Amino acid sequence: MKTVILLTFLWGLSCALPVARYQNTESESSEERTGNLAQSPPPPMANSDHTDSSESGEELGSDRSQYRPAGGLSKSAGMDADKEEDEDDSGDDTFGDEDNGPGPEERQWGGPSRLDSDEDSADTTQSSEDSTSQENSAQDTPSDSKDHHSDEADSRPEAGDSTQDSESEEYRVGGGSEGESSHGDGSEFDDEGMQSDDPGSTRSDRGHTRMSSAGIRSEESKGDHEPTSTQDSDDSQDVEFSSRKSFRRSRVSEEDDRGELADSNSRETQSVSTEDFRSKEESRSETQEDTAETQSQEDSPEGQDPSSESSEEAGEPSQESSSESQEGVASESRGDNPDNTSQTGDQRDSESSEEDRLNTFSSSESQSTEEQGDSESNESLSLSEESQESAQDEDSSSQEGLQSQSASRESRSQESQSEQDSRSEENRDSDSQDSSRSKEESNSTGSTSSSEEDNHPKNIEADNRKLIVDAYHNKPIGDQDDNDCQDGY
């Protein structure tokens, strides 16, 4: 029953009694946060953990202050050394009077509840020590604001869970829940902090701290958006730069294509020019060959004369040798033995005779060449005369042909005229015959018409009679026989 009463009393305290010391700790934490904002936004995780631990501490402090009697003895005098050490470690100089000893009611009720409360207080002291160590590390490293901001959302529900666990453990404990608190870990409170009982002020301070944390978050989110926007702008610039590069490459490729087309066109023009030059050279070589052929043809009759002259010159020494042999034979046949003088004279005579012969031979050669030229000229003249004669013959033949054609035309015209005359005579005869025939026909037609007129009434009467007979004998109209049978059957 006592444990149930204690639990209900603790529940009423946690719902109704405010903690004045919580305001002081929140104001100090807000001052530290503003100081850290000057350099960089501090991690809110450490602050949230610290505030949660302070909430658990103030609940314990309120319980202790509630159950502390007027004449109770506090054991804070013996723990001053521990308090000073904790001040140096945590950096907080806000500590309350510690009551590590049990109250008078705990002494009356006994020790089992005291042991349970000691275990719960040990758990809370460990959580508060962790929070103070995180706060110190956050103060030493203020530059890691973004990482702590990402950890803040994770740490807050954990901190809330730790406070709820500590409260549930306090509710479960049967014996005195005031327990021995931790030794100077920043969660104890002074007796002066319990004097203010205004819950509105604590709530306003909590709302202020939440607004400040929201402002810090907005600033951090702005800081996060700024680099993302700069990254987006950098990405857009990279895309524009890459598009410009691709456009430049396309332009370069187009220029290369144009250059290749120009090169191909220049090559084609060069090939055409070289072909034209070659054709011109070939035409020139052909003209040169034609001129050389014409010159060789012109030089061929002239070249025959020196060849004939060389053959004649080669024949001269043979003639000289033959003449000398003849003279020697003549001298031997005479049997003369002339002297040297006669021999020399004979030699001179023979030389002179040879010269005369050479002269005569050369003259004969010149005459032969002249005769050849005359013969060639005569031949050309004869050819020209023959051509003239052939032309005259052609003219005469053409004239004869024209004469024969004219004679044939005249004969044809005469024949056509005679034929026309005969035809005209025949036509006249036929006309006379036609006229006689027409007269005869007219006469015959007149006689026939008169005879037909005479025979016409007779035929009508006969027809009428036949019709009457036919009707009497029941004969058809087309039946002209005397038989009873119809024609065609």
UniProtKB/Swiss-Prot annotation:
InterPro entries referenced in this protein's UniProt entry, alphabetically: DMP1 (IPR009889)
Organism: Rattus norvegicus
Superkingdom: Eukaryota
Motif Cell attachment site per record, residues: 334-336
CC per GO annotation: cytoplasm; extracellular matrix; extracellular region; nucleus
Biological processes annotated in GO: biomineral tissue development; extracellular matrix organization; ossification; positive regulation of cell-substrate adhesion; regulation of bone mineralization; regulation of enamel mineralization
Residues linked to a glycan: 340, 378, 443
Subunit organization: Interacts with importin alpha.
Signal peptide residue numbers: 1-16
Entries under Pfam families matching the protein: DMP1
Annotated TM spans: none
GO molecular function, one term: Hsp70 protein binding
Keyword Secreted: yes
Ranges for region Disordered: 22-489
Biased composition (Acidic residues): 82-100, 386-397, 479-489
Low complexity compositional bias, start-end: 123-138, 316-332, 398-419
Biased composition annotated in UniProt, kind: Basic and acidic residues: 143-159, 217-227, 275-287, 346-358, 420-442, 453-478
Cellular compartment(s): Nucleus; Cytoplasm; Secreted, Extracellular space, Extracellular matrix
Expressing tissues: Expressed in tooth particularly in odontoblast and ameloblast.
Ranges of biased composition (kind: Polar residues): 263-274
Modifications after synthesis and translation: Phosphorylated in the cytosol and extracellular matrix and unphosphorylated in the nucleus. Phosphorylation is necessary for nucleocytoplasmic transport and may be catalyzed by a nuclear isoform of CK2 and can be augmented by calcium. Phosphorylated (in vitro) by FAM20C in the extracellular medium at sites within the S-x-E/pS motif.
Keywords assigned by UniProt, alphabetized: Biomineralization, Cytoplasm, Extracellular matrix, Glycoprotein, Nucleus, Phosphoprotein, Secreted, Signal
Gene name in the database record: Dmp1
Record protein name field: Dentin matrix acidic phosphoprotein 1
Function: May have a dual function during osteoblast differentiation. In the nucleus of undifferentiated osteoblasts, unphosphorylated form acts as a transcriptional component for activation of osteoblast-specific genes like osteocalcin. During the osteoblast to osteocyte transition phase it is phosphorylated and exported into the extracellular matrix, where it regulates nucleation of hydroxyapatite.
